[in-house]
Amino acid sequence: MSSFRVLDLVKPLTGYLPEVIAPERKVPFNQKLMWTGVTLLIFLVMSEIPLYGIVSSESSDPLFWLRMMLASNRGTLMELGISPIVSSGMVFQLLQGTQLLDVNLESKTDRETFQTAQKLFAILLSIGQATVYVLTGIYGRPSDLGVGVCLLLILQLVFAGIIVILLDELLQKGYGLGSGISLFMATNICEQIFWKAFAPTTVNNGRGDEFEGAVVALFHLLSVRKDKRRALVEAFYRQNLPNIFQLLATFIVFFLVVYLQGFRYEIPVRSTRQRGQNGLYPIKLFYTSNTPIMLQSALTSNFFIISQMLFQRFPLNPVVRLFGVWDARPGSAQLFASNGLAYYIQPPLSLTEALLDPIKTVIYVSFVLSVCALFSKTWIEISGTAPRDVAKQFKDQGLVIAGRRETSVYKELKRIIPTAAAFGGASIGALSVACDLLGTLGSGTSILLAVTTIYSYYEIAAKEGGFQKHIVEGFSEAF
């Protein structure tokens, strides 16, 4: 007797959803590079095409805290970014990991239905988010825009969202390298860093016209100032604009994260099926990769968005003010928390600000480290990388820990993995805090996401393309 499952509701819709057909044969590495490049080009073009019908505004961006992480570009076709895909993926992984959704991922049929359900939910999220964005007045008051323009804006956002979903599916099914989510996120972050370093545009922050790009400003100041020492100091430490110190800090963090990627605890294992077969099972320092900092950033960013919306509507309400008081900084229309809970979990905007308010800094650092460690320990239970899951993999593959009895594998893994996950989560949280305090070109979260994604792409390319992986390993060992 077969029982009904929620996933069975999705099966009749499979033929109606847009789909990328899986390749019939293995795609050569050169073609994967080409398709990855084409996918990236489409993303970049969509990031520059403005939405038709919006009323341009210089007001505060309520989604400011999520833009870089979600590969979102305000006022363009990439307004939603990868938000629908990320949200859908996390929801379904949570449902599957907690066994609230009955699915057997070892079954090809179940796996395909599960992926179809994720895609359907991502499309529904695109429709829902697009509708909310338009009706809440992000592009202008709906009454001023009119019904026709509002519908047109929603259609543009939904169409762009579906294109992003299909581009991600194109890479996931083997036509390209990695996933669209990681590729778009890292590209968006690197694009923002490159712009802050080399932007030729000028801005006026009360000191006259200055070049926005840190490197361009350095050469400009050295060429026009007679006092070269003063020009260097200004280029390295100028306020409210990207500077050379921030650029150098970004490079330092980049190489530090690459170096730390090589840190791992190796468990000696042996095969019970083949005599003399020994090996090592590595547990990396970043056992859960960048997931903890993504979840922490998503949590705080959504809290900031809700707090801002409530404060703009009820600025005098004491409960709302307890959550956060929001003001614009000089020379910017963007709102930042100046009091309330939001202020204490908002990263300091500079090292000077962190030193001037040590209580806020201590609270912020403690919050990030503890939340990242907690999310990391929780995520291993959801994602199938907990000690119980790894012990099952060992049993299925006929592996045991060398020098231990077969029955003690789970106990040994339970002693190591949760500790490694929590420590790794706290470590990546500490790196994020360091980025925020040093003022890197981009938030700590975005820098870490970009670096870990670039490193994972290097590993994929090393595996797929066959070029030597020991270059990075040699760099790690050199330290």
UniProtKB/Swiss-Prot annotation:
PANTHER family: SECY/SEC61-ALPHA FAMILY MEMBER. It is found in: Endoplasmic reticulum membrane. GO terms for molecular function: peptide transmembrane transporter activity; protein-transporting ATPase activity; signal sequence binding. GO terms for cellular component: fungal-type vacuole; Sec61 translocon complex. It holds the Pfam family Plug_translocon. NCBIfam families: 3a0501s007, PRK08568.1-5. Its main location: endoplasmic reticulum. This is Protein transport protein SEC61 subunit alpha. The chain crosses the membrane at residues 34-54, 77-97, 120-140, 147-167, 247-267, 362-382, 416-434, 441-458. Belongs to the SecY/SEC61-alpha family. One of its GO terms (biological process) is post-translational protein targeting to membrane, translocation. It is a multi-pass membrane protein. Heterotrimeric complex composed of SEC61-alpha, SEC61-beta and SEC61-gamma. The keyword Endoplasmic reticulum applies. Residues 1-33, 98-119, 168-246, 383-415, 459-479 are cytoplasmic. Appears to play a crucial role in the insertion of secretory and membrane polypeptides into the ER. It is required for assembly of membrane and secretory proteins and is essential for cell growth. It interacts with other membrane proteins required for protein translocation. Upon binding to SEC62/63 complex, secretory precursor polypeptides may engage SEC61 to begin membrane penetration event. A cycle of assembly and disassembly of SEC62/63 from SEC61 may govern the activity of the translocase. Disulfide bonds: none annotated. Residues 55-76, 141-146, 268-361, 435-440 are lumenal. Keywords: Endoplasmic reticulum, Membrane, Protein transport, Translocation, Transmembrane, Transmembrane helix, Transport.
